[in-house]
Amino acid sequence: RGICAIPYVRQRDNATVYFPVNIIGNLYVSNGMSAGNTPAEARTQALSEIFERYAKFRIISEGLCLPDVPQAVINRYPRIAAGIQGLRDAGFGILVKDASMGGQFPVMNVTLLNPQDQGCFARFGAHPRFEVALERALTELLQGRALDALGGFPAPGFDLEEVASSPNIEIHFVDSSGVIHWNFLGDQPDFPFHDWNFSGTTAEDYQWSVNAIQAMGRDIYVADFQHLGVYACRVLVPGMSEIYPVDELEWENNSIANPIREAILNLSDLDHDECSDLMET
């Protein structure tokens, strides 16, 4: 029947490349999807999400320790500082960290430590503007949760292999409730603090994001969508924006049931032997 594929435009040379829908659904899921008032705004948000998850997964899986953000820097943003202080006043330990990995990525981290159950809950936010990235990390921490629902997260672990395992990383993608390695809470950061800010106009934010990813040797592919006057896009960066490992295509492929689809759609027409074969399958 052929392969269902969607055209994407490679930003490096404007070449059109077709990506099979099955590969997108298996490996990238919702990562890099965005809508906005303008193409530049939506694409910047999509790339920011890709930056966030790429940095987050590397930091968690490699057990990296991030530098703290000085209080003087946090105080530049009174609303954010007040939100952080409010959580501390409620009895939670709040760590604010620079997740740019040495100024490479526009990513920030806010981590909550619950003294009641020793749970550790780390959230990340990304945007070329430092303030927006920090605010996103803080709001992600409380997204869909009241203060009395900030318990039940796992305590940090010592087994880096477990922390870096695909099931744990998958949980971090779903709701960030996976295990964090104790190294993350250490006092010897793997990178110095960078007081970064890569922001300019919306168009400049997008161009900076593109340049940063292409400087890593990665290609950016964009599919544009318009519906009822609203612009949306989906961005893929092979080697960077995958949520699931390529092995998923072999072991957990969404198309695994294709050979029995016809039988399922015609159950009433199957004879006894065909029903038995389908059940065994």
Language model features by range: what are they?
Residues 1-281:
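Helix-biased "structured C-terminal domain" signature
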